[in-house]
Amino acid sequence: MVKTLFQASAWNALEAGSFDGAVSVRELLRCADTGVGIGTALDGVITFENGAAYKTAPDGKVTVMRPEDGVAFAAAMVFDENAPEIALNGIDDLTSLKQMLAPFVQGNPNLFYMIKAGGVFKSVHTQSWNSCRKPYPMLSEAAKSWNEFRFENTRGNVIAVWCPRYVGGICMPDWHFHYLSSDKTQGGHVLDLSAERLHLKINRIGRFDLLLPQTTEFARCELREGKSAAACIRF
């Protein structure tokens, strides 16, 4: 059965300052249970895990989101937990994890992929946004201000999505990693990590479903191809 990636909003809309909720948590969790996202007004980094939405706020506090809470951007799916488990050893940093994941993508880099990599992490370095007020700035401007967090000897899961390069603009190409600890007290967008051993599950995704915002901000966006703000936010 072909798996589907559900995406709320377009990445270049987020770059253009469309930070209002494209979808509610309730709506997103009707069609997905695992993934990554960003809160309305950039008020936190979202990790979807096991059918719940966890937001790492600008101060680092992790909370369970309410069904009515808004999501400015998300990429999520119904994750197949029956996927084979693969052991990864000697993960020195995020770059080495990406190198270990490369063979799984190289077979068909034109598809989408999502992973869950769990275990005890020697270190995790994350960030979360500072929320914005209207009129919203461009993402490149908002990305100049964020908060970083460092955790050691923490157990949890990294959830990450891979989008192929040809969908750049609509999606953010390559890997995008979020972390959530098992006790749901630590999280955020991953800047770096290390671990002696992780247990990896990977899902290959062959269908893409895009939900565009029905907001005033989105209607006013001048969407076009161009340089991604990703370079400014260390993704």
Predicted feature residues:
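Hydrophobic, proline/glycine-rich low-complexity stretches
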Residues: 1-11
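N-terminal low-complexity or amphipathic/hydrophobic leaders
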Residues: 13-78
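A glycine-rich, hydrophobic loop/mini-helix early in the fold
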Residues: 56-108
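A hydrophobic, small-residue-rich beta->alpha segment in the mid-to-C-terminal subdomain
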Residues: 181-224
